[in-house]
Swiss-Prot record:
E.C. no: 2.4.2.4
Protein name per the record: Putative thymidine phosphorylase
Catalytic activity line of the entry: thymidine + phosphate = 2-deoxy-alpha-D-ribose 1-phosphate + thymine
NCBIfam families: ARCH_P_rylase, PRK04350.1
Species per Swiss-Prot/TrEMBL record: Bradyrhizobium diazoefficiens (strain JCM 10833 / BCRC 13528 / IAM 13628 / NBRC 14792 / USDA 110)
């Protein structure tokens, strides 16, 4: 707070604006209590009440529907975090920038940061004291270089900034894929297999930021995922596992803040990725962790050398924090499963768990392989027996029964399972063999169609790499709910549909339904 500027009081007004993770407040240019021209030189202000402080980005308006002359309008995130009723008088002053920003500037200049400096930055991030611009500055500074000690300090600070779970079991397993592959909903098959065996697997997952579905978005089609800490513990106690949204239990909140900025800017460096994943797994109380690194031309990791470097980073951090970490590389050349988008991916998962004859074989096989690795952490299971045990649990229906138990424990979903009513097909332009699939382009196309906000939007794949196709045969179908999304997706597919048949792009269908 600036001591030379007097504070004034304004009444809280709730402004129904979704400003993402950033706190934003609005004052009137004709404010009776505050002179807007004085505040114009300050990008941030402090709201204070009974020891509670909220830092927010300031906007000035001429619209009385956002803030009257005696009011300060709080965006939805700011209103939720300040947690005071509409009409409450609060003190408003220009904000002093967080002291930790000096360390951010030092990092940009090339200095190595101490553990205390990194801890201060993460603490301020976790309390939403940074604007998106300041977050980007930290990410850019860290992207230039980060030492091993800084990586460990960053991981530890992020893990300690939120909820830290402790479990009574000596072995608590978990798995994580670094992402980038459409579909690939293996966690929703692996968790019930491992839980049915008896190993605890408390799986917390993220929502999509730049992809058409995260595990939490897909699980939400089947069950409630906004579960609190105590309820999560009760579910794991009764079911040996869960599939919930990690943001609701406040695991590594600073990481969620960083991800919200770094993903859209494509600033996801190897070190930041490792710190992000490991901080959440450490905070979740996992003792044994399996990391899946898909490798492919349009995946996050494109080659074996890059995958090896990433593996060593995961193993290094895991060792320093006393965790057993196993890293495997998998085929990242194409989507896993037939669906891209929450409802379509949930359908794939339930088909695999139900041993449906039309279930995607790639999703089934990859899930069995991953589950096998985790099951072999059970000291009572002899070495090499993991795959057979995983297949037994899946084929017998035990995994499906366990999934239903988890769904019942988490509570019913309120989401529709209907697919988008509008659709169009992408068809092969000529006879041949599917030679390549662009994962990144399909992800973008599914998002353009409305996923994950519209859970029934997305893409259903009919052909994979190596499949023979005839001219005019559908390669995939795009689903949307609204005409604008349908038309945007059709235009995007016309510009590049993500499939190559004998090295040539397919052409979009002229017909739509």
């Amino acid at each position: 707070m600036h001591p030379d500027l007097p504070h004034s009081q304004l009444k809280i007004r709730r402004v129904r604006l979704d400003t993402g993770r950033e706190n934003v407040v609005v004052i009137s240019r004709q404010s009776k209590a505050l002179r807007a021209e004085i505040f114009r030189g300050f990008s941030r202000v402090e709201l204070r009440l009974n020891g509670k402080v909220l830092l927010a980005t300031l906007l000035i308006t001429d619209d009385d529907t956002l803030a009257a002359q005696d009011e300060i309008g709080l965006s939805e995130p700011a209103f939720r975090r300040f947690a005071e009723p509409v009409g409450t008088l609060v003190a408003v002053t220009p904000a002093t920038p967080p002291e930790s920003l000096e360390a951010v500037r030092a990092k940009i200049r090339g200095r190595t940061l101490s553990q205390a400096e990194i801890g201060a930055i993460i603490n301020d991030l976790a309390h939403y004291r940074y604007s998106d611009m300041e977050i980007a500055a930290f990410l850019i500074g860290s992207a230039s270089f980060i030492t091993s000690d800084e990586l460990l300090a960053l991981t530890g600070a992020m893990a300690q900034a939120g909820t830290q779970l402790v479990w009574p079991d000596p072995v608590v397993v978990d798995k994580h894929c670094i992402g980038g592959i459409p579909g690939n909903r293996t966690s929703m098959v692996v968790v019930p297999i491992v839980a049915a065996h008896g190993l605890p697997i408390p799986k917390t997952s993220s929502r999509a930021i730049t992809s058409p579905a995260g595990t939490a978005d897909t699980m939400e089609v089947l069950a409630r995922v906004n579960v609190g800490v105590e309820e999560m513990k009760a579910i794991v106690s009764s079911c040996n596992g869960c599939l919930i949204w990690g943001g609701h239990v406040n695991l590594s909140p600073a990481d969620d803040v960083l991800i919200s900025v770094e993903r859209p800017l494509s600033l996801d460096t190897r070190e930041q990725m490792v710190a992000s994943i490991m901080s959440k797994k450490i905070a979740a109380g996992s003792t044994h962790l399996l990391i899946d690194i898909p490798v492919g031309p349009t995946a996050k990791v494109t080659g074996a050398v890059e995958a090896m470097r990433l593996r060593k980073l995961f193993e290094f951090v895991g060792d320093r924090f006393g965790r057993t970490v196993e890293v495997i590389t998998t085929d990242g050349r194409q989507p896993i499963g037939n669906g891209i988008g929450p409802v379509l991916e949930a359908n794939d998962v339930m088909a695999v768990l139900g041993n449906d004859k039309d279930a995607p074989r790639d999703l089934r096989e990859k899930s069995l392989r991953l589950a096998a690795h985790l099951l072999e952490y059970d000291p009572k299971l002899r070495g090499g027996a993991g795959y057979a045990r995983a297949r037994e649990l899946l084929d017998s229906g035990a995994a499906l029964k366990q999934m239903q138990k988890i769904i019942d424990a988490q509570g019913p979903s309120t989401c529709s399972t209907e697919l988008g009513s509008l659709s169009f097909d992408i068809k092969a332009a000529h006879d041949g063999t599917v030679s390549a699939i662009d994962c990144l382009r399909l992800n973008r196309l599914a998002r353009t169609a409305g996923a994950p906000l519209d859970k029934g939007a997305g893409i259903r794949l009919f052909k994979k790499i190596g499949d023979h196709v005839e001219q005019g045969e559908p390669l995939y179908r795009v689903y949307a709910f609204d005409q604008p999304e349908h038309d945007l997706a059709a235009s995007a597919a016309a510009a590049g549909n993500g499939y190559a048949v004998d090295g040539h792009d397919a052409l979009p269908s002229k017909t739509a339904s």
